[in-house]
């Protein structure tokens, strides 16, 4: 969801040992179905990733790892190739919509996304923070404006991570964010 984002002059996906991108249809660069990409400059990591995505096979019928079927279908690649040509235009439209939101919401008492001088936000989501989230949702809904709650449960409280033994109250900032974050509509065609 950070396709085209930058931090101190470096693009997302080029920092660290590996980068990961989702091509879920709702993302800034979305396929027609499921898909994703891993980036790396490390040849050994790239070799391992290629094997893991193809049932662990180094070459056909020669499986050296326990892998999965994570190959991107050709039609998905074709869709992405066409959409990639438009990504920068769509990103700038999202950034313009975010500026409009900033202008309209400044002074409203809600927390706004921050755009630092040394980074480039691509606004997959435009999320505000407010302790009055339900009131905002109701007011927006009354105007036929959709809003959404992304990630309503902090990771440490998800059943999948119960074995780690974390309890409510141990990560108060994450818990507060889960209760306050509200996503406003964000897409390139937003007017």
Labelled PLM ranges:
Residues 1, 24, 34, 50-54, ...:
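Histidine-centered beta-alpha loop that forms part of the nucleotide-sugar donor binding/catalytic region
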Residues 1-22, 29, 154:
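Conserved PLP phosphate-binding loop immediately N-terminal to the Schiff-base lysine helix
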Residues 6, 41-191:
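PLP-dependent aminotransferase class I/II
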Residues 11-15, 38, 165-168:
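Short, hinge-like loop/turn segments at secondary-structure boundaries
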Residues 15, 34, 126:
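Acidic, glycine-centered active-site loop in nucleotide-sugar glycosyltransferases
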Residues 24-26, 187:
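Residue-level recognition of the GNAT/N-acetyltransferase active site
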Residues 28, 32-37:
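Glycine-rich phosphate-binding loop of ATP-grasp-fold ATP-dependent ligases
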């Amino acid at each position: 969801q950070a396709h085209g984002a930058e931090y101190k002059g470096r693009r997302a996906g080029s920092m660290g040992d590996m980068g990961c991108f989702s091509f879920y249809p709702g993302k800034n660069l979305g396929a027609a179905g499921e898909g994703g990409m891993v980036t790396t400059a490390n040849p050994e990591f790239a070799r391992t990733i290629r094997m893991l995505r193809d049932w662990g096979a180094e070459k056909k019928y020669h499986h050296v790892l326990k892998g999965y079927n994570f190959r991107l279908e050709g039609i998905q690649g074709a869709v992405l190739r066409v959409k990639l040509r438009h990504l920068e235009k769509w990103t700038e439209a999202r950034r313009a919509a975010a500026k409009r939101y900033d202008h309209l919401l400044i002074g409203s008492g809600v927390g706004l996304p921050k755009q630092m001088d040394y980074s480039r936000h691509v606004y997959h989501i435009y999320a505000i923070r407010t302790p009055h989230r339900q009131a905002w949702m109701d007011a927006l809904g009354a105007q036929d404006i959709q809003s959404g709650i992304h990630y309503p449960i902090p990771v440490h409280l998800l059943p999948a991570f119960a074995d780690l033994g974390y309890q409510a109250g141990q990560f108060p900032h994450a818990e507060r964010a889960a209760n306050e974050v509200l996503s406003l509509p964000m897409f390139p065609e937003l007017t």
